[in-house]
Amino acid sequence: MTYTQASGYSQGYAGSTSYFGGMDCGSYLTPMHHQLPGPGATLSPMGTNAVTSHLNQSPASLSTQGYGAS
């Protein structure tokens, strides 16, 4: 019984939501889309912000990304 439930849960989580990082990424994507029509310079920092939030668990990777964007 537990095995079946785990399998179902895994399949449900493997959806697009998991791929996008859950609602967290979705929330950050909303403002990013609003800034899309704006200048390209705004897109750079905005994108980094979204990635930074996603890489909150990896401070090392976050630092590298921030430096690269700068």
Swiss-Prot record:
Q: What is its main location?
A: nucleus
Relate the induction remark in this record: Up-regulated by FGF2 treatment in embryonic telencephalon primary cultures.
Molecular function terms, GO-annotated: DNA-binding transcription activator activity, RNA polymerase II-specific; RNA polymerase II cis-regulatory region sequence-specific DNA binding; sequence-specific double-stranded DNA binding
- Biological process according to GO: animal organ morphogenesis; anterior/posterior pattern specification; axon guidance; cell fate commitment; cellular response to leukemia inhibitory factor; central nervous system development; diencephalon morphogenesis; dopaminergic neuron differentiation
- The organism's superkingdom is given as Eukaryota
Composition bias of kind Polar residues appears in 45-70
Q: Which InterPro entries match?
A: Otx_TF_C
Q: A Pfam family in this protein?
A: TF_Otx
Extract one GO cellular component term from the record.
growth cone
Cell compartments where the protein resides:
Nucleus
Disordered, as annotated region:
34-70
Any idea which UniProt keywords this protein has?
A: Developmental protein, DNA-binding, Homeobox, Nucleus
State what this protein does: Transcription factor probably involved in the development of the brain and the sense organs. Can bind to the bicoid/BCD target sequence (BTS): 5'-TCTAATCCC-3'.
The entry sums up its family as follows: Belongs to the paired homeobox family. Bicoid subfamily.
Q: What is this protein called?
A: Homeobox protein OTX2
Q: Which organism is it from?
A: Rattus norvegicus
Q: What is the lineage of its organism?
A: Eukaryota, Metazoa, Chordata, Craniata, Vertebrata
Q: Which gene is transcribed and translated to give this protein?
A: Otx2
